[in-house]
Amino acid sequence: MVADSQGNVSIADPSLNIIRKMTPGAVVTSPAGNCLISGFADGSGNNAHFDAPRDIAIDTSDNLYIIDSNNYAMRKMSPLGVVSTIVHGSYGFADGTGSAVKFGGNASGIAVDSAGNIYVADTGNNRIRKVTPAGEVTTLAGNGTAGSVNGTGAGAQFNSPMRLAVDGSGNVYVTELLKRRIRKITPAGVVTTFVP
């Protein structure tokens, strides 16, 4: 759930494959997605299709960033409701660009920093991924092994990372479902346990 500069609240609805928005006056709309279609398509309104949009983030320009989980994609929705694709990969694990990118099942957390970089909790791969505005995907931290080891980059381990937040200095905070911890990742990829 995110709030924009006008006080509107948006959520991703994975069961209906839509994005919902509620105004400060409690008017609820569905600005993108089609509850009758589970699929993949860019566009506006119900011409845009999602397959289990799982989490949502917002930038300072009120653009929404969406994990389109079953499409292994990161999508962007403008304030006017136009949906575009930043990266569309497939199942597995691979960094890179375009269709070469792979995400694990149930990628579940997303956050965006002030430079427009997206951070994804790749839950199935126990990694935190970074997606640049140009769509280049790299692994910020984690090596795929489930654990709670602090370290740098691939020297760190996560156990089912779920939700993310980014502070003004570019540090990423990660919640772990199974260990019930909050981890901190610096922009250089140094992982520490923030809340044990």
Located regions from the model:
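A short loop-to-beta-strand structural motif that recurs across blades of beta-propeller domains
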Residues: 17-21, 27, 72-76, 82, ...
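Residues marking helix boundaries in flexible regions
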Residues: 12, 57-59, 67, 87, ...
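Residue-level detector of Asp-centered blade-edge/turn motifs that repeat once per structural unit
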Residues: 3-6, 58-61, 112-115, 166-169
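Conserved beta-propeller blade signature
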Residues: 8-10, 63-66, 117-120, 171-173
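Short loop/turn segments immediately following the C-termini of beta-strands
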Residues: 14-15, 69-70, 123-124, 177
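Gly/Pro-rich loop segments of beta-rich domains
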Residues: 25-54, 82-108, 136-162, 190-196
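Short intrinsically disordered, low-complexity coil segments enriched in acidic
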Residues: 1-7, 11, 17
